[in-house]
Amino acid sequence: MSSQMTVIIAGIVLVVAIVVALVVMRRGDSRFTYDTQHGTAPRATEGEGNTASTAFKGRFSILTTGVGAMFAALAVKLWGMQMVSSDYYEKQANSNQTRTVTTPAVRGRILDRNGVALVQNRPSLAVVAYRDLAEDEVLVRHLANVLGMPYVAVLRNIQDNTEGAQSLHTIATDVRRSTVAYIQEHAGEFPGVKIAERTERQYPYGETACHILGYTGTITSEQLEAQNKKTSGDDDASAGKITYQSGDIVGQAGVESYYENLLQGIRGEQTVKVDASGNVTGQAGAVPAKAGSDIKLTLDLKIQQACETALASAIELAKTTGYSNAGNGAVVCLDPNNGEILGMASQPKFDPSVFIGGVSNDVWTELNDDKGSHPLLNRAISGQYMSASTIKPLSALAGLEFGTYTSGQTTNCTGYWTGLGKSWGKYCWLHSGHGTMTLQSGIANSCDPVFYDMGKAFFYDEQHPEGLQEVFRRWGLGKTCGIDLPSEGAGRIPDAEWKESYFTDASAEDRKWNAGDMTNIAIGQGDILVTPLQMACAYMGLANGGKQYVPHVFLSAVSRDGDGDAYKYNGKGKKKRLEAKINSDSDLALVRNGMHDVIYTASTSLAAHFGTLTPQVYGKSGTGEKSGEDEYAWFCAYAPADDPKYVIATVLEQGGGGSDTAMHVVRDVLGVIYGEPDTSSASGDSSVR
């Protein structure tokens, strides 16, 4: 507080004290007598033994003592205000002359591995206002009509208490320029309403990689509460901390959500001077906002687009070849040497730009309709399916390891297997039978009875009755792979304990694990569930001799303020995800030979299509059977066979046989990678499943 103000206050107190003194003196306790005989004026007299002068002096002494005490107290208070609490009162005074406005930070971009922007920002306009605007109902309703928003929504945004009372509150974002022009041209109708520059997300390649990139949206109350708990105790928004307010835009899915802490910037502050009416008269200071970091992904845009195009084409092929219910599917392409995801597609796709500025109820319902195809679902990591015959290479390794099926063992396939008795007979997918099959030819021709024999042997093996499940889990099935994306599915490897607890309404006898259950999972049927990503990771192990790495999409983060790389992938992907133990090199060689024969020996169609590629490809098809639906088509492979650089796993829901439709996804993606498109006109055949 200034010395001038101190003097003024002291003067006012002095005047008040004098007035009080005069009043008190005039109201003394005097008694008056009158000389009625001589008509003289009244004479003041005091009590007995006292004079008026003595009484006056006493009262004056008391008065001066009181006034002195008042001045002493005032002096102490003024000293405290000026010397001890001067900073506090100065801030209080300044707060009545200034307003602090938070400024949003620009969100970081998302790039592919070559620096191509997959998500960037574009300028946009927002309507903002101070909280006291809420007191003018007529104005709020007028503004709501102009913005095309419900009155309650506008009022709620203005009254939002997560932003400071003197901060500008965001009422609407990404406002059309025609609306902005109207507000500016009729500024007199909207006192206190302002237009602010903002940025919104922009997707240069539309729906490309939508399930990986995700989308953004306004922070929910639950998210805001959670974020506030994380930053509780941090009162200074400019102290290098990410803070959140109602109305903020945050990641809601995909990379946008998983790496929110990197993409979100640190808001700034701008202090402005205002007059008594609240009008801005100048600048008082500013703390600039810090943009979020750019994230570089492992994705290669060329491979990503190839995955999406190949998947869509295969689905259309399935529709034209008798599978009219085809429409959904997924594909994963990764580098087996480090776990980097090079491409990942899920069908159907969605347009992430529909979430900018808020998604309508109709669109949200359409995207989440239980009867629809769930376009928001990333089937590559969240879709869970029967693995079908793509799991047979792992079954073969399990049989070889535990001795339930040896390399020299044979099975006579007649098309109908009765290993558990005629009443429990099972068909091979090829009803005419394959004849005599070894384990290698069983893989090549996908002969079911070979694996029925193996499943039966496991069930009756007293030492390793669940050795098959043990191997599946060792190769990463039945648990998440650990990818850095939200909502990864764990799949399921059924066993006796699971069956007992799952079918609670069944009889005790029906809840028991039986030999039929084991023969089912040996061929990838029954209650087994896997994701396309899990199968890609399993085939990563087949390509690498058992080595598997954590699949990931993050490559590095680059600071926007010129600091360079914020940090790179922490190396977790360079460590083994798990030890997929292989009993011997000869076991792996047998399985790989079987996968070679799938493509180049057992099927003339596959040989025709893949034979035009320079690198050799090892793989396995699969055809899942689900009651009441068409067959599910699978194909998993890696290439080049002698030095694997790419692993691809794909599934088409109700898309037919794996060697008929799904194999085209793998062939087309490899064709783009190697610049060798599929020129074969050979139609799919059913010689392998």
Give residue spans per PLM region:
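Beta-lactam-recognizing serine transpeptidase/beta-lactamase-like catalytic domain environment
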Residues: 273-286, 299, 329, 336-390, ...
